[in-house]
């Protein structure tokens, strides 16, 4: 009875924590919108200042924007994180030993989070990534208590 009650408490705790993870992932997704446009605007301004002209090569700016967007896009990582969150919830709600699988899921989520952190184009994203890492670490520690 005690183990079952403790198991239920851990399960509820993990579900609350993974919901926090989901909220942070959503926040990162929201903050990632408009970053490329912001970059293009800054780039155009910088080029005009350096060249001391109001005429800029729009094609060149567009090329740079594509390169920047390619390097900083976190769409794939966000998609995978959302997929991992769904799988995590399914595992937590399933019967049987899931500790090892959950541990691997957290490792994968950490990997995606680190990639997002290395591509972060704003302070808001960086802050959310740090919060996400803390939350994932807390989940990882909690998982150590289950089979």
Stretches found by the model and what they are:
Residues 1-147:
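N-terminal intrinsically disordered, cationic/polar leader segments
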């Amino acid at each position: 009875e005690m183990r079952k009650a403790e198991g239920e408490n851990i399960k509820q705790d993990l579900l609350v924590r993974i919901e926090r993870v989901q909220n942070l992932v959503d926040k990162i997704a929201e903050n990632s919108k408009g970053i490329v446009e912001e970059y293009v605007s800054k780039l155009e301004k910088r080029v005009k200042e350096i060249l001391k002209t109001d005429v800029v090569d729009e094609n060149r700016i567009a090329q740079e924007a594509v390169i920047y967007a390619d390097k900083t896009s976190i769409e794939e990582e966000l998609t995978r994180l959302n997929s991992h969150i769904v799988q995590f919830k399914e595992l937590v709600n399933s019967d049987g030993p899931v500790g090892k699988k959950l541990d691997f899921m957290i490792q994968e989520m950490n990997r995606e989070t680190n990639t997002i952190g290395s591509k972060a184009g704003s302070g808001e994203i960086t802050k959310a990534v740090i919060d996400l890492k803390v939350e994932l670490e807390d989940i990882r520690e909690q998982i150590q208590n289950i089979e």
